[in-house]
């Protein structure tokens, strides 16, 4: 399978490349810099230069790689998870997640139905009995901060679910 990973140099993207290569998939990694190209090449992926916030460059990357699956692990989280750094990174992280997701989904595919896996979140589930699964509701009636996070992830999933030609999987971890 031909797999394109957006967010390939992050904490999840790097081991994901290794796992996919071990299973003999052809792996492409969306990168913005020569340093990132070097990292993903060392891991066995083919770098594809594009900026997730630039729809034209994302379209060109999709056209070039013709993936059967796109895995969206895009974030813009700080190196250290202090309250101050998280606040400082929040606006950019939100932009990367929303616009990057939209650009990846908007790129037309001519490879038939494409699988689209999106990093979602399990942190925003509504309380319930037993284990939660992908059908569990987000906590929309929680505190303002939790409800905002829940709405954000629900919106990302809804956009993917509404995209024609996409077999969507929300990765809630």
Language-model features, listed with the residues they occupy:
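Conserved beta-strand positions in the Rossmann-like core of class I SAM-dependent methyltransferases
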Residues: 28, 48, 169
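Conserved hydrophobic beta-strands of the Rossmann-like cofactor-binding core
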Residues: 3-5, 70-71, 116
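Conserved beta-loop-beta element that borders a ligand/cofactor-binding pocket
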Residues: 115, 120-121, 157-173
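N-terminal Rossmann NAD(P)H-binding glycine-rich loop of SDR-like oxidoreductase domains
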Residues: 3-25
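Conserved Rossmann-fold NAD(P)-dependent oxidoreductase catalytic core, especially the SDR/UDP-sugar
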Residues: 80-147
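NAD(P)H-binding glycine-rich loop region in Rossmannoid oxidoreductase-like domains
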Residues: 34-41, 45-103
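Conserved glycine-rich Rossmann-like NAD(P)H-binding loop of the short-chain dehydrogenase/reductase
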Residues: 25-32
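Rossmann-fold NAD(P)-dependent oxidoreductase module
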Residues: 15, 19, 107, 159
